[in-house]
């Protein structure tokens, strides 16, 4: 993955929550933010993934804070945000990174599978942002970054649910920016292409 030049920007004193950042793109974003002074907070759905993430951060000298939380569960998210605020501090930066993809032809995909992708990739960013925005308003502003994917712009075979979710996330990003810009909350989306994360590299290697 691309490396961030230390002190490319100053995040000293800022608390950044990156969802699903126990590995992959989320971890790379978190490491870049930490290199520029941010305090890193992340979540994952299983304790073993949180523990693995904490160990990976510790290996490079980052004291991260990890929480077990299902970001599709509004009550759990509200509880996590309250706990982070109490234990770490007010969240200044949110990166909605957690996501899943199911590569299944549309006619073979069940409605339940479609809903699961929409729930994680679209509903969850709404839930987490909704939980954090009131405190950002009270603190005088904040930053929200949504990982939208190039699939928010393109259609591809076998990813109908993922593309639909990411397209929706792109529009949610625009609406958050429009609705809360007056409160000094900036919301932007990033549409990365194919990134060689550990999981994707494993899948590529196994296909040869």
What does each of the following model-derived ranges do?
Residues 149:
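Residue(s) in the substrate-gating loop at a strand-loop-helix junction
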Residues 134, 178-182:
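Alpha-helical segment proximal to the catalytic Tyr-Lys
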Residues 47-48, 68-80, 111:
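The beta1-alpha1 cofactor-binding region of Rossmann-like NAD(H)/NADP(H)-dependent oxidoreductases
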Residues 129, 165, 173:
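Active-site helix of classical SDR
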Residues 104-107, 154-160, 182-183:
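Active-site loop immediately N-terminal to the catalytic Tyr-X3-Lys motif
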Residues 15, 22-23:
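Conserved glycine-rich cofactor-binding loop
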Residues 105-106, 113-118, 200:
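Substrate-binding pocket helix/loop in short-chain dehydrogenase/reductase
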């Amino acid at each position: 993955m691309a490396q961030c030049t230390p002190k490319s920007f100053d995040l000293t004193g800022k608390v950044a929550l990156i969802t699903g950042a126990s590995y992959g793109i989320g971890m790379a974003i978190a490491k870049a933010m930490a290199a520029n002074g941010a305090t890193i907070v992340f979540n994952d759905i299983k304790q073993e993934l949180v523990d693995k993430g904490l160990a990976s951060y510790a290996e490079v000298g980052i004291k991260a804070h990890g929480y077990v939380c299902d970001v599709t569960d509004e009550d759990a998210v509200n509880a996590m945000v309250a706990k982070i605020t109490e234990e770490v501090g007010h969240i200044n930066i949110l990166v909605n990174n957690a996501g899943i993809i199911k590569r299944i032809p549309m006619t073979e995909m069940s409605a339940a599978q479609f809903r699961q992708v929409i729930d994680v990739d679209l509903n969850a960013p709404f839930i987490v942002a909704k939980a954090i925005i009131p405190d950002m308003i009270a603190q005088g502003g904040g930053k929200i970054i949504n990982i939208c994917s190039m699939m928010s712009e393109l259609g591809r075979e076998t990813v109908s649910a993922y593309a639909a979710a990411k397209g929706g996330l792109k529009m949610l990003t625009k609406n958050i920016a429009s609705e809360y810009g007056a409160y000094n909350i900036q919301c932007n989306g990033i549409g990365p292409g194919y990134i060689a994360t550990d999981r994707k590299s494993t899948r590529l290697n196994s296909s040869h």
